[in-house]
UniProtKB/Swiss-Prot annotation:
One GO-annotated biological process of the protein: translation
Chain's gene name: rpsG
Species whose genome carries this gene: Shigella flexneri serotype 5b (strain 8401)
Keyword Ribonucleoprotein in annotation: yes
PROSITE patterns xref list: RIBOSOMAL_S7
Chain's role: One of the primary rRNA binding proteins, it binds directly to 16S rRNA where it nucleates assembly of the head domain of the 30S subunit. Is located at the subunit interface close to the decoding center, probably blocks exit of the E-site tRNA.
Gene Ontology MF term list: rRNA binding; structural constituent of ribosome; tRNA binding
Family, similarity comment: Belongs to the universal ribosomal protein uS7 family.
Subunit structure: Part of the 30S ribosomal subunit. Contacts proteins S9 and S11.
Protein name: Small ribosomal subunit protein uS7
GO cellular component, as recorded: small ribosomal subunit
PANTHER family assigned to the protein according to its UniProt record, in alphabetical order: RIBOSOMAL PROTEIN S7
């Protein structure tokens, strides 16, 4: 296979009801067996319930919940001299959203409520209040990165250069040891 050029990321069509690309991605992550209309109805129903509980608009409430679950750092395995180290690295912006959405959907699927729409609404509302399984997952990932910050100097250069190519902001990383 030729390795000459990098294929660009595909543009995703915005959500038909709210016009949000983020929400369209969320629907795609929730979708099972290609049943997009089912996934859309679950998400819209959950957002409606969430908006009634929070008193905010559907999109605003979703954004708050997502913001509370987005990780800023994670650990990646790096093999150095026969031993494997968990090296903390900053998470790229696109991956932050993807991880947060994936964690929310996983947590909602594990809940014991009646319908998936209700499970999703409850998980999103917990995330908006900084509690719940998805937020706990983010805290665990951050705790792992904090515990392994001694290995931050094992980061490889390709990650740093990749984060700048991906359009990451030039501001300081969330934790000081990643400089």
């Amino acid at each position: 296979m030729p390795r000459r050029r990098v294929i660009g990321q595909r543009k995703i069509l915005p959500d038909p009801k709210f016009g949000s690309e983020l929400l369209a991605k969320f629907v795609n992550i929730l979708m099972v067996d290609g049943k997009k209309s089912t996934a859309e109805s679950i998400v819209y129903s959950a957002l409606e319930t969430l908006a009634q509980r929070s008193g905010k608009s559907e999109l605003e409430a979703f954004e708050v919940a997502l913001e509370n679950v987005r990780p800023t750092v994670e650990v990646k395995s790096r093999r150095v001299g026969g031993s494997t180290y968990q090296v903390p690295v900053e998470v790229r912006p696109v991956r932050r959203n993807a991880l947060a959405m994936r964690w929310i959907v996983e947590a909602a699927r594990k809940r014991g409520d009646k319908s998936m729409a209700l499970r999703l609404a409850n998980e999103l509302s917990d995330a908006a209040e900084n509690k719940g399984t998805a937020v706990k997952k983010r805290e665990d990932v951050h705790r792992m990165a904090e515990a392994n910050k001694a290995f931050a100097h094992y980061r490889w250069k390709s990650l740093r250069s990749f984060s700048h190519q991906a359009g990451a902001s030039s501001k300081q990383p969330a934790l000081g040891y990643l400089n």
